[in-house]
Structures are given as structure tokens and as C-alpha cells.
């Protein structure tokens, strides 16, 4: 398909999904520096919150270095052309968080649910639209649902008021044909004015290819992160995606070289570990496991002596999804007992 001249809105994940590998410990100065770099490079939309969205600060998901209010309040006044978005997962974030985000100047709210649980998004999507916000329905772990099931869930979110629907490959499991099948079906079912988006992870090195497949299927919003900073092996690497789009004539409005500099000079130096496809993050993609489970599995591995890869494969076998982080340690402990390993950890 000829994509030359097609316009796409790129949505940066560095300061939200990138909080997962940073264990939510990004400083305000790091946030501001990277956000300003992204803004100057021409990125139109930048997501800023705890990795698990508004209200994510908790024992289950991790305590951040600063509150959502502090991060948003630091970044938004500095933006010259970029708008700022926030993620919200019903059950973690509340309507009060929505109002706080609106008051701070957030432009876009993305309401995220598991791909078969769109009905829990009604209150938050409805309220977001009442507040006049650009409102996105975000269907996570989309590889676990058939195209037909995704269509039914997308239509629910559209009916609640979402003006954009995302098909989200949270596990980095999908291949380009999987992406096309799902996004094509959803695109055909939505109103013409409802936008379609795609969020990928790079666990099988498919982030860029899947994003191009999504554009071919009708997506006009694509998520990516500078230097790929995100859960698992990271999100679609923004600087690579922008270069590929430039080669193909897809219009993003982002400067090819400035976004490279943001990735290399601002994002790579703050990484706690190199974001790459190691055996554990590769296993996320292969077994279809939620990407933010990676560090939880590594911690459980160190505690119980069961290889992280084995834990991740078992999580995939059990079909665990986002929100079940507390079950990762339980799974590792059970596996250790079954293997006769001595449980010395407190």
C-alpha cells in the first residue's frame, strides 16, 4: 500500500511507559529536559504519568519519585507546541484524577482496560468527554481477543464517547498480519470520524513493522518512545519509526535528527539498564505476557531462585493480565516449592 502523504500523529511514551524500567523514579529535571527535547523535535503529543497511569502510586504498582500532579505541573507549562496526555486505568485512577489532570492542562485522557473489559471504562470516558478532553479508549493485551471481539469492545468505548480507539499490543506478541487483521476490523466498524491508534512493544523486534502495518490498516495515531524507553524490550523506538516514516513519505511533523538527539543525548543516559531484547523480554513477546511484568518477574526470580523466563512462560500459560501483578510473586513461590527449592527469603 502506498502511504506517501499520509499524516500520522505520533504519541510519545518515554515519560509514561518509560517509567516502568525506571521503577517510576524519574526526576522532575529528567522529565522536563526530555519533554522539552521532544517538544522541540516536533512531537505533538507526550504522555506523562506514573507507568500505570493516574493514581498508580501504590504498593502493587510502585511508588514514584514524585506525584502525578508534580510531574504534570512541571512539564505542561514548558510546552511550546506539544500537548500532554495522561493514562487512566479504571480501578486505579478515579474521576477526581481526571478533574485534576484537566485543571493542570492535560489535553488528552486515555482510558485503558483489558481488551475484553471495555464496559468498565464507561464512567471515565463519559466524564472525560464532559470535561471537553480528547478522549481515547485504550484496549490492552489485544492479542488475547479476536478481531470480532475487539470490534465489539471498541464500539462500546465509542458509544461512551471516545473519539479515538487504540488497539494495544501490551505484550509485544503480535506480528504484522495480526495487527492488520485487528485494526482493519476495528477501522471498518468505527464511525469515519473516530480515530484509530496503535501502541506496540518491541519484544519481538516488531514495533516499527507493526506500526507501519497499523497505518496501512487505517491508524492515524501511533505510540512510540525515544530510545524505546518502555516496559519489556521497550516501546516502538521513536527515532527509528520517524526515520522509516520519512523514508516512506509518511508525514509526522517530527524532525528526524532532533528526535535522534533526544534519544541518544537525553534518554539513553538516564536508563537504569539498557533497553534491549534479552531472553526475558523476548519471552514476554513469545509467550504473550504483559510487558510491565518484566521487572516484577526478575525480582521474584532473585527472591525464589526460579529463572525469570520460566516465571514469564508460566504467567503466559495462566493467561495473566495487567492488574495481576500481585500474583507474580505467588506464582514464583509456588514454582519454587514444586521444584523443591529452599525458600529462604523473608
Curated annotation (Swiss-Prot):
Pathway: Xenobiotic degradation; polychlorinated biphenyl degradation. Belongs to the 4-hydroxy-2-oxovalerate aldolase family. The aldol addition reaction proceeds via a compulsory order mechanism, with pyruvate binding first. Heterotetramer composed of two BphI (aldolase) and two BphJ (dehydrogenase). Its EC number is 4.1.3.39, 4.1.3.43. The record marks 16 as: Transition state stabilizer. It catalyses: (S)-4-hydroxy-2-oxopentanoate = acetaldehyde + pyruvate; (S)-4-hydroxy-2-oxohexanoate = propanal + pyruvate. It comes from the Bacteria. One of its GO terms (biological process) is catabolic process. Mn(2+) binds at residues 17, 199, 201. This is 4-hydroxy-2-oxovalerate aldolase 4. The lineage of its organism: Bacteria, Pseudomonadati, Pseudomonadota, Betaproteobacteria, Burkholderiales. The record marks 290 as: Governs stereochemical control. The active site is at residue 20. The gene is bphI.
Amino acid at each position: 500500500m502506498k502511504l506517501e502523504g499520509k499524516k500520522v500523529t505520533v504519541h510519545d511514551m518515554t515519560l509514561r511507559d518509560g517509567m516502568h524500567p525506571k521503577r517510576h523514579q524519574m526526576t522532575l529535571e529528567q522529565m522536563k529536559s526530555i519533554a522539552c527535547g521532544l517538544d522541540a523535535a516536533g512531537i505533538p503529543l507526550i504522555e506523562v504519568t506514573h507507568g500505570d497511569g493516574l493514581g498508580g502510586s501504590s504498593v502493587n504498582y510502585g511508588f514514584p519519585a514524585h506525584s502525578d500532579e508534580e510531574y504534570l505541573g512541571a512539564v505542561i507549562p514548558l510546552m511550546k507546541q506539544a500537548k500532554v496526555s495522561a493514562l487512566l486505568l479504571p480501578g486505579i485512577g478515579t474521576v477526581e484524577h481526571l478533574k485534576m489532570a484537566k485543571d493542570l492542562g492535560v489535553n488528552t485522557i486515555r482510558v485503558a482496560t483489558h481488551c475484553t473489559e471495555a464496559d468498565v471504562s464507561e464512567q471515565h470516558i463519559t466524564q472525560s468527554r464532559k470535561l471537553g478532553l480528547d478522549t481515547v479508549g485504550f484496549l490492552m493485551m489485544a492479542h488475547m481477543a479476536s478481531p470480532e471481539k475487539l470490534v465489539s469492545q471498541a464500539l462500546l468505548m465509542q458509544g461512551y464517547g471516545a473519539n479515538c480507539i487504540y488497539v494495544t499490543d501490551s505484550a509485544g506478541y503480535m506480528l504484522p498480519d495480526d495487527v492488520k487483521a485487528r485494526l482493519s476490523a476495528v477501522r471498518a466498524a468505527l464511525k469515519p470520524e473516530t480515530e484509530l491508534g496503535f501502541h506496540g512493544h518491541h519484544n519481538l523486534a516488531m514495533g516499527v513493522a507493526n506500526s507501519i502495518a497499523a497505518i496501512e490498516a487505517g491508524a492515524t495515531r501511533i505510540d512510540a518512545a525515544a530510545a524505546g524507553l518502555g516496559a519489556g524490550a521497550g516501546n516502538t523506538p521513536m527515532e527509528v519509526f520517524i526515520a522509516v516514516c520519512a523514508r516512506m513519505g509518511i508525514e509526522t511533523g517530527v524532525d528526524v535528527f532532533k528526535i535522534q538527539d533526544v534519544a541518544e543525548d537525553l534518554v539513553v543516559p538516564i536508563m537504569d539498564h539498557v533497553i534491549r531484547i534479552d531472553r526475558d523480554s523476548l519471552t514476554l513477546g513469545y509467550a504473550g505476557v504483559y510487558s510491565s511484568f518484566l521487572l516484577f518477574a526478575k525480582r521474584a526470580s532473585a527472591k525464589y531462585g526460579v529463572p525469570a523466563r520460566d516465571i514469564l512462560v508460566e504467567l503466559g500459560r495462566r493467561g495473566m493480565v495487567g492488574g495481576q501483578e500481585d500474583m507474580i510473586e505467588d506464582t514464583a513461590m509456588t514454582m519454587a516449592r514444586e521444584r523443591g527449592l529452599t525458600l529462604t527469603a523473608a
